[in-house]
């Protein structure tokens, strides 16, 4: 009887030990399920983030075959009424290290701050490197008819519907090395344009370069 009792007692720990693998398997399955869910979320998030293959802001279309785009932000500084702000386009390294790659188009998209309550004219012009971007030199660029002008004005909801303009540069054979000759000109028409009242988002669509997969967007 004693031996039978001791035998029963000896089996209980074994039953307990046999249950550990079951608990471990359940934990492992739960961990795998959570990991798979996280991986799906990461993949979904990555798919929605801008990449070099992501549709550009250019009319919500994808880049032309063999092309990608580089984005820049231009923030006009304080500009008095009747005066202008100018800034040349300088593409970052390593894009600028491939000056012979073709540029197909440039898009300018305006994002106003909540305090913006004026009217601005914006244009993109190719100007010699020695050309002065001072106000007295550039106003005529808005009236000579040689380049399209985006006229952007304050609206009650804060964002004008037509807030972007596209410049097709492919007919003139523009290359990356030519971009420093292009300047964004902003004319403050009705009031003083304060610092950071407006942001100009610039998308430059150009041929892919060898290290394109490593470029930030």
Swiss-Prot record:
<dbReference type="GO" id="GO:0039617">
    <property type="term" value="C:T=3 icosahedral viral capsid"/>
</dbReference>
<feature type="disulfide bond">
    <location>
        <begin position="63"/>
        <end position="105"/>
    </location>
</feature>
<protein>
    <recommendedName>
        <fullName>Capsid protein</fullName>
    </recommendedName>
</protein>
<feature type="modified residue" description="N-acetylmethionine; by host">
    <location>
        <position position="1"/>
    </location>
</feature>
<keyword id="KW-0694">RNA-binding</keyword>
<comment type="similarity">
    <text>Belongs to the cucumovirus capsid protein family.</text>
</comment>
<feature type="compositionally biased region" description="Basic residues">
    <location>
        <begin position="11"/>
        <end position="20"/>
    </location>
</feature>
<dbReference type="GO" id="GO:0019013">
    <property type="term" value="C:viral nucleocapsid"/>
</dbReference>
<keyword id="KW-0007">Acetylation</keyword>
<dbReference type="Pfam" id="PF00760">
    <property type="entry name" value="Cucumo_coat"/>
</dbReference>
<feature type="region of interest" description="Disordered">
    <location>
        <begin position="1"/>
        <end position="24"/>
    </location>
</feature>
<dbReference type="GO" id="GO:0003723">
    <property type="term" value="F:RNA binding"/>
</dbReference>
<keyword id="KW-1142">T=3 icosahedral capsid protein</keyword>
<keyword id="KW-0543">Viral nucleoprotein</keyword>
<dbReference type="GO" id="GO:1990904">
    <property type="term" value="C:ribonucleoprotein complex"/>
</dbReference>
<dbReference type="GO" id="GO:0005198">
    <property type="term" value="F:structural molecule activity"/>
</dbReference>
<keyword id="KW-0167">Capsid protein</keyword>
<comment type="function">
    <text>Capsid protein. Probably binds RNA and plays a role in packaging.</text>
</comment>
<keyword id="KW-0946">Virion</keyword>
<dbReference type="InterPro" id="IPR037137">
    <property type="entry name" value="Cucumovirus_coat_Asu_sf"/>
</dbReference>
<dbReference type="InterPro" id="IPR000247">
    <property type="entry name" value="Cucumovirus_coat"/>
</dbReference>
<keyword id="KW-1015">Disulfide bond</keyword>
<keyword id="KW-0687">Ribonucleoprotein</keyword>
């Amino acid at each position: 009887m004693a031996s039978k009792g001791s035998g029963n007692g000896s089996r209980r720990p074994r039953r307990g030990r046999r249950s550990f693998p079951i608990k471990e398997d359940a934990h492992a399955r739960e961990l795998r399920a959570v990991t798979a869910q996280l991986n799906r979320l990461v993949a979904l998030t990555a798919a929605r983030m801008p990449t070099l293959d992501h549709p550009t802001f250019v009319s919500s279309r994808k880049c032309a075959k063999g092309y990608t785009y580089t984005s820049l932000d231009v923030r006009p500084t304080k500009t008095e009424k009747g005066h202008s702000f100018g800034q040349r386009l300088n593409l970052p390294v390593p894009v600028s290290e491939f000056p012979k790659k073709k540029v197909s188009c440039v898009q300018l998209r305006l994002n106003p701050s909540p305090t913006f309550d004026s009217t601005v004219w914006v244009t993109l012009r190719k100007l010699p490197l020695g050309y002065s971007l001072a106000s007295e030199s550039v106003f005529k660029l808005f009236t000579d008819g040689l380049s399209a002008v985006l006229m952007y004005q304050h609206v009650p909801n804060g964002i004008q519907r037509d807030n972007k303009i596209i410049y097709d540069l492919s007919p003139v054979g523009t290359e990356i090395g030519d971009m420093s000759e292009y300047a964004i000109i902003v004319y403050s028409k009705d009031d003083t344009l304060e610092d950071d009242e407006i942001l100009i988002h610039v998308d430059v669509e150009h041929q892919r370069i060898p290290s394109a997969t490593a470029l930030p967007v």
